[in-house]
Amino acid sequence: MPELPEVETTRKGIQPKVEGQAIQKIIIRNGKLRWPVDPSLVEKLPGLVVLSIKRRAKYLLLETDQGHLIIHLGMSGNLRVLPQHEPAVKHDHIDLLLENGFLLRYHDPRRFGSWLWTEAPIQEHSLLKSLGPEPLTDAFNAEYLFQKLQGRKTAIKTFIMNNQIVVGVGNIYANESLFLSGIHPTRPAQSLTLTEATKLTAHIKTVLSAAIEQGGTTLKDFLTPDGKPGYFEQKLNVYGRENLPCPQCDSAIEKVVLNQRAAYFCSNCQKQLDSTVKIK
């Protein structure tokens, strides 16, 4: 699934040729995504100018003077900017044709992404209004995280993947951040000290920033808008490396399942305070 770095890479990739352009038309080949695409967009969008392209969590927000397109890439989606004469292939579900001769093409084999339209204030949309702070902003800091940890028995990995706590820390980057912080993923969130919260906050920021610089992580379907894979996979320390040697101590990387998601860790470098503590 594309996570924050992949979505930010997409935003940066499409921005130069999409922002500031008038929409000529939208072609909806298959609107059966996670939520049905509003067929009235065929009438609503032509003539509108894309004023800005922003990201909130894993949502791309295309602003016009009449409303916003809210795009989510789902499990397997990607966006590419192509010449308008480029023929569509299987799973190319939506094209946004622009006045500069290019189009924004949405490709999604599993069709779990979404294209939504809203004319209400964007910050009040039901998908956005309850989200936590962006991890790369000053609002996400050690003091904030430590305060949120108090009284929470949830496993720390599950906790930092909660979008109401902080947005965009998906499975790959949660595993990597915890490894660099020396924190076992199953530890109760409330067990972290302020020092550990400080380390974890810093590593979440550095891991996400590094992933954005590398164009994200391509594990299966994700491609950047120019059709290239992300290269952060080459820098992964623990994610997807079960039974391979830890890059710090050569112990075997282990794997457990937390909240239906895989957690990868080195039990030597990431100590569990008490293996009898119940987690959820």
UniProtKB/Swiss-Prot annotation:
Q: Which residues form the active site?
A: P2, E3, K58, R261
Query: What is catalyzed by this enzyme?
Result: Hydrolysis of DNA containing ring-opened 7-methylguanine residues, releasing 2,6-diamino-4-hydroxy-5-(N-methyl)formamidopyrimidine; 2'-deoxyribonucleotide-(2'-deoxyribose 5'-phosphate)-2'-deoxyribonucleotide-DNA = a 3'-end 2'-deoxyribonucleotide-(2,3-dehydro-2,3-deoxyribose 5'-phosphate)-DNA + a 5'-end 5'-phospho-2'-deoxyribonucleoside-DNA + H(+)
Name the cofactor(s) required for activity, per the record: Zn(2+)
| Record PROSITE patterns | FPG_CAT (PS51068), ZF_FPG_2 (PS51066)
Example GO molecular function: 8-oxo-7,8-dihydroguanine DNA N-glycosylase activity
Leader sequence range is none
SMART domains in the record, alphabetically? Fapy_DNA_glyco, H2TH
- For this chain's UniProt record, which GO biological process terms are given? base-excision repair
UniProt entry keywords in alphabetical sequence: DNA damage, DNA repair, DNA-binding, Glycosidase, Hydrolase, Lyase, Metal-binding, Multifunctional enzyme, Zinc, Zinc-finger
Gene3D superfamilies per UniProt = 1.10.8.50, MutM-like, N-terminal
EC number(s) on record?
3.2.2.23, 4.2.99.18
Q: Is DNA damage a UniProt keyword of this protein?
A: yes
* Membrane-crossing residue ranges in chain numbering: none
Fetch the InterPro entries from UniProt: DNA_glyclase/AP_lyase_DNA-bd, Formamido-pyr_DNA_Glyclase, FPG_cat, MutM-like_N-ter, Ribosomal_uS13-like_H2TH, Znf_DNA_glyclase/AP_lyase, Znf_FPG/IleRS
Q: How is the cofactor bound?
A: Binds 1 zinc ion per subunit.
Question: For binding DNA, which residues are annotated in this chain's numbering?
Answer: H91, R110, R152
PANTHER family from the UniProt entry: FORMAMIDOPYRIMIDINE-DNA GLYCOSYLASE
Q: Which family does the similarity line name?
A: Belongs to the FPG family.
Give the protein's function: Involved in base excision repair of DNA damaged by oxidation or by mutagenic agents. Acts as a DNA glycosylase that recognizes and removes damaged bases. Has a preference for oxidized purines, such as 7,8-dihydro-8-oxoguanine (8-oxoG). Has AP (apurinic/apyrimidinic) lyase activity and introduces nicks in the DNA strand. Cleaves the DNA backbone by beta-delta elimination to generate a single-strand break at the site of the removed base with both 3'- and 5'-phosphates.
Describe its assembly.
Answer: Monomer.
Q: What is this protein called?
A: Formamidopyrimidine-DNA glycosylase
User: Which gene holds the coding sequence for this protein?
Assistant: mutM
